[in-house]
Curated annotation (Swiss-Prot):
Keywords: Ribonucleoprotein, Ribosomal protein. CDD domains: Ribosomal_L13 (cd00392). Coiled coil: none annotated. GO terms for molecular function: structural constituent of ribosome. GO terms for biological process: translation. The gene is RPL13AA. Pfam families: Ribosomal_L13. PROSITE patterns: RIBOSOMAL_L13. Belongs to the universal ribosomal protein uL13 family. This is Large ribosomal subunit protein uL13z. HAMAP family: Ribosomal_uL13. The keyword Ligase does not apply. It comes from Arabidopsis thaliana (Mouse-ear cress).
Amino acid sequence: MVSGSGICAKRVVVDARHHMLGRLASVVAKDLLNGQNIVVVRCEEICLSGGLVRQKMKYMRFLRKRMNTKPSHGPIHFRAPSKIFWRTVRGMIPHKTKRGANALARLKVFEGVPTPYDKIKRMVVPDALKVLRLQAGHKYCLLGRLSSEVGWNHYDTIKELENKRKERAQAVYERKKQLSKLRAKAEKVAEEKLGSQLDVLAPVKY
């Protein structure tokens, strides 16, 4: 994502759908420390290896970890998929140092694809894709489904908003395809009409 110099002003939007949690977090953490600005969308579609029951048991064990005298002091147990991913990245960054805090500030995480980023080209990370990293037939579960099982209440809302966004995107794509056909047809008609005049203009690359 980032050049060897570690300087890249451009913000990279990563589509987290069907990426493995730890592998994606490690790549994102490294690039954040190198100076890259990163936005991660569709965090609810991130995959975890292991079945849902197993992952839920692990998370319930994590929920029991707290400070006896004052539980609000920590650890903080995030339920939202975006915050779980953010916390995973934070664990791979020296976030208590100035450099680490600045790196973490360059990360934005979202469920779904909010409006500023739905019109920006999204990237994937091949090193973290489920189809390349998880053995065929191996059990896995989605982070959004796990979150909904342990107290996150917006899974259905995000799914509904995502369906609406996909419908809008499909309508835009169909319109663009139609305009492309009309343009090709108009160019063909103009080519037939102009004929020899185009041969005159060709040397000057008009």
